[in-house]
UniProtKB/Swiss-Prot annotation:
The Kinesin motor domain, residue ranges: 183-515
Predominant subcellular localization, coarse grouping: cytoplasm
GO molecular function ontology, one term from the record: ATP binding
Similarity annotation: Belongs to the TRAFAC class myosin-kinesin ATPase superfamily. Kinesin family. KIN-13 subfamily.
Record's comment on post-translational modification: Phosphorylated by PLK.
SUPFAM superfamilies named in the record: P-loop containing nucleoside triphosphate hydrolases, SAM/Pointed domain
Binding site for ATP: 273-280
Compositional bias per record (Low complexity), positions renumbered to this chain: 82-92
Lineage of the organism: Eukaryota, Metamonada, Diplomonadida, Hexamitidae, Giardiinae
Name of this protein: Kinesin-like protein KIN-13
PROSITE patterns, per the entry: KINESIN_MOTOR_1 (PS00411), KINESIN_MOTOR_2 (PS50067), SAM_DOMAIN (PS50105)
InterPro entries: Kinesin-like_fam, Kinesin_motor_CS, Kinesin_motor_dom, Kinesin_motor_dom_sf, P-loop_NTPase, SAM, SAM/pointed_sf
Amino acid sequence: MSDLVYQWLESANLQQYYPAFEQQGITPQRFITITIQDYGALGIQALPDKQKLFRLITTLKSRENILEQQPSAPNTGATPQSVPSSHVSPHVAQGDRFVGDKQKQNDIQQAQDMSLYESYDGGYEPPYVSAQGSGPANGDDYVIPTIPYHPNAPNPPNPRGIPTVNRTVVPPVDLFLNQIQSRIRVVIRKRPINPKELSQNQRDVVTADGWNQVSIHEPKVKVDLTKYTDLHTFKFDHVFNEQSDNQEIYQYAAKPLIRSVFEGKNCTVFAYGQTGSGKSFTMMHKDNGIYVLACFDILEYLRVYNGSQGNNSKFLVPVVSFFEIYGGKLFDLLNNRQRLQALEDGKGNVQITGLTEKQISSVDAMLNLIDSGLTLRAVGATGANADSSRSHAILQIALKYTKSGKEYSRISFIDLAGSERASDVQNSDRQTRMEGAEINKSLLALKECIRAMDKSNDSKSGAHIPFRGSKLTMVLRDSFIGNSQTVMIANISPNDKSCDNTLNTLRYADRVKELQHGKGGIIKFNVLKMGQNAADVILGTARDDENDVYKAGIVGVNAAPSQQARVPPASQAPITARQIQQNLPQPHYNPNYNPPNSKPAFEPRVETTDEDDMVRTHCDLVDSIYEQEDLIVRAHRRQVDSMMQLVKEEVALLHAIENDQVSIDDWLVKLSDILSRKEEAITTLKGNLSAFKQALQKEEELSHSIDLNKARKK
């Protein structure tokens, strides 16, 4: 089996490290469990070699029964160092970025005929420059894969390669190359159903229908207890099914942004979704999270970029910062969670005072920083998840000029706090409810900023971007203006118990992307949003927007095509979602046709105006409570400082009267003045506390009213 380890290393041109592996007693079983932190102990220090080993191990992990698939090496008595070159190397999965030489890569291409490669020849070339590739132009062993052909490429022996070549998730080449130029891209990731959900007899109700469409088969029960399935269909830029891994997500969603960063653009990748849907796994996984994979490529691109610059003053260095937004406040995760302040300078730029920024030179250095920061991140239990992230974690990698320190560009990786329905947090304590309201408000503000950014991209005069709507959008202001690109990864859970949250996630993502309809890019499939947008209820702060036109269309088999709702021309006055609901035509009933598992007829949704108003009021009240909290904390600090000053004056006055340095009359006057000022400071603080207690009591009563309203509907 030691020959097998040598063959694996040889396939990646890492055979020179085999003695260290042999000395450490690395078996094939241990080989595939090696982590990045172990590379140093094995003598692997060079960044290109670390990349090769990382991709080799990831490839081997992705192939099922890798050890059983390998033929037993003949026992000829030869040492691993003397293994002849004629030994067959392990089959290299599609998309591997390590090859031995030009002939070896050509052999791989002939054997699989499913992957396009472009060469890395030391020049600064983008990874997606052409849909036609013919292998490396020289013998360099580092190549950057592009996307495979579709739909003509044959199915690989293992659909879990890197990247996964699943015919249901691979977009057309020409369309994908056009997509990555868009300022906004929205992709969906479906996680696998887990054993706990299966043990609870939960069903998978999410299907990825092709590379850009997802369907939700929502189980429902009518008033007469008749069960039926309501079908919801959405289309996005890309849909990843449960077989997709982080490598594939990064390859298609985030990697194109790396090129944009080196073009001077500010880029943002954020993961959104219900708690437990895989956001942190996608963004912050310590071995193959998107930020880890991006750091590999950023450092490699940076080496190439700096090598192409003749002037040292144009050299760039990566600088990392990591902070969280919790309860509307900023905390530095690289400095023991110290409080930060987001302030605007005279030019209108947002500056985060006190933020720790550390220059990195390797992936290991960044991993150590992030691991220490993640231990400080705020988590808590909700009705949706027992270990929910209650803060937005923002990791920023800025490229700065070496000499001047001026920022050239920046890429932000955002692991958003979990989005829950109002009912998921209403039965929790006040702190959890307030956290949920603040989270939902910031998520709504983020959506509105992205949509406004899209409007400004189409408008000659530009549209106002409401980045002051929350602390999240305020600190990300540079990502919403100027030359910027954004990718949203919406994570969804497949089980039927999370169906409501899954639908709300998709509706949120659909609202982010809906303005792309009718433009020169993707033509979206119009999907009916039933009645008042349910996402508005969940977010708790959305209001009827008279300037929005909800693109409506009935998804079902009983409505005739001519009777589907139409969007009015742009010249007509815009209408609201409620008006569309009222103006929908009556469904066409066919008594002789009742397909199975489909909704027999369209049932109008019961209006929930009172509940909507209460949820909105609750969110506004929570926002006011957070503002009052900051004011009271500052008032308390002023009161303490004032008391300390008065105590000093009182002690000095006491010494004076004891030493006969002041007359009794003067002592009485000064002491009376000190006590009056003490009483005034205490009275003022107590008044602030009384108003704050009333706001908390009102929040408690409003939350209880929402619970009662939901209980009556059940």
